[in-house]
């Protein structure tokens, strides 16, 4: 730890030689005691049903099955694919009842963007819709029946270079097999499925089935701005917040969900005094949304709320800064970008999930606004 402190002292000295350390947001106009941030300790617990994640191949160059697996009970489906051909293609979600009895699938929430070549727009629209939590649907399947699920007409037709991205939570009373597929524009999807091949994953291997699709992070002790100064928790760094491991059901191989896409986080905070909360991207471009819950009120906050994305102005971390951050010390510098999440005192929680097309990790930053 002394080694980390020595490195960080050098980092601070180098940063201050360039002038005052101020973040690029309205928070820059606030007074706070230090630009050094300290990691806040959290309890972490995973729970919930099964995530089916389909993002490989991300750039789809031929027709076929992108991913498939069988689930029962609570589940979440997340897909992210781009038509990387020179012709129109269709994307399909197909549910198959694998049981001898009638099966009902209740979709409890979802988010879907119309296909687009603007990846950040697609990711932000999808996550905003998911966080607004006002989409429900119901699918009924007879014994061994297959059915194409297409909730929005023409949302599943992709022009060359367009991206489709969606997420939905559902509950099934019997085992159902889910197929994600790219197929010719004018083909019959069920007929094509009967002869379609499973496409090989790309080098990033971002597809698979992951148990316990939800994660709860809870502060170990209430945040006291007078005592703690600037504080933060890290999400998606694979050191403080570990990536989920799962299985690619198409070949049985173990896979890692780099970024924890499709994992739904509940972030629980308790503060002693009025505290400002911010989201700060550390990995690059970022465009998303989250939901806050505060003493009977709730709402969706886009991150950022004043433009499509941010994080592009944050300079890359050098090795010393990244190492110090992983050990619990970080700087709020002139290049730090912040998206305001609101001011809260007492108990507040946020529902968060890494948005498609965006980069991890992120900091949730806590800044004192009063001391008593």
What are these regions, as identified by a protein language model?
Residues 20-28:
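Sec-dependent signal peptide cleavage junction
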Residues 29-68, 203-242:
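A eukaryote-biased signal for short, well-structured alpha-helical docking elements
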Residues 62-108, 113, 134-138, 146-178, ...:
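Long compositionally biased, domain-poor regions of proteins
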Residues 105, 173-220, 358-372:
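Exposed low-complexity, polar/acidic, P/S/T/G-rich flexible segments that act as propeptides
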Residues 115-117:
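Basic, glycine-/proline-tolerant helical and adjacent loop/strand elements
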């Amino acid at each position: 730890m002394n080694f980390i402190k020595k490195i960080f002292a050098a980092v601070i000295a180098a940063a201050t030689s360039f002038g005052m350390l101020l973040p690029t947001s309205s928070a820059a106009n606030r007074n706070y005691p230090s630009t050094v941030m300290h990691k806040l300790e959290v309890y972490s617990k995973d729970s919930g049903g099964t995530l089916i994640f389909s993002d490989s191949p991300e750039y789809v160059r031929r027709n076929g099955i992108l991913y498939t697996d069988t689930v029962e009970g609570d589940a979440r489906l997340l897909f992210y694919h781009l038509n990387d051909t020179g012709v129109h293609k269709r994307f399909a979600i197909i549910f198959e009842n694998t049981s001898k009895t009638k099966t009902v699938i209740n979709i409890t929430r979802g988010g879907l963007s119309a296909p687009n070549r603007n990846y950040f727009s697609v990711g932000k629209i999808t996550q905003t819709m998911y966080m607004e939590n006002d989409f429900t649907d119901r699918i009924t399947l007879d014994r061994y029946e297959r059915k194409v699920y297409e909730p929005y007409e023409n949302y599943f037709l992709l022009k060359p270079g367009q991206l489709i991205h969606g997420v939905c939570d559902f509950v099934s009373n019997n085992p159902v097999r889910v197929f994600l597929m790219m197929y010719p524009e004018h083909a019959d999807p069920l007929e094509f499925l009967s002869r379609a091949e499973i496409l090989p994953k790309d080098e990033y291997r971002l597809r698979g089935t992951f148990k316990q699709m939800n994660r709860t992070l809870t502060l170990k002790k209430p945040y006291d701005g007078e005592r703690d100064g600037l504080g933060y928790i890290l999400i998606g760094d694979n050191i403080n917040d570990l990536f989920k491991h799962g299985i690619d059901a198409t070949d049985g191989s173990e896979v890692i969900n780099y970024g924890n896409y499709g994992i739904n986080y509940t972030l629980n905070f308790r503060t002693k005094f009025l505290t400002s909360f911010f989201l700060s991207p550390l990995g690059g471009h970022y465009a998303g949304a989250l939901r806050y819950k505060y003493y009977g009120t709730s709402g969706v906050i886009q991150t950022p709320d004043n433009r499509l994305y941010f994080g592009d102005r944050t300079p890359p971390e050098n090795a010393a800064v990244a190492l110090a951050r992983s050990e619990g010390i970080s700087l709020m510098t002139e290049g730090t970008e912040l998206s305001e999440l609101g001011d809260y005192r007492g108990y507040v929680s946020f529902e968060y999930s890494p948005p498609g097309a965006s980069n991890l990790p992120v900091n949730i930053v806590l800044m004192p606004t009063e001391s008593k």
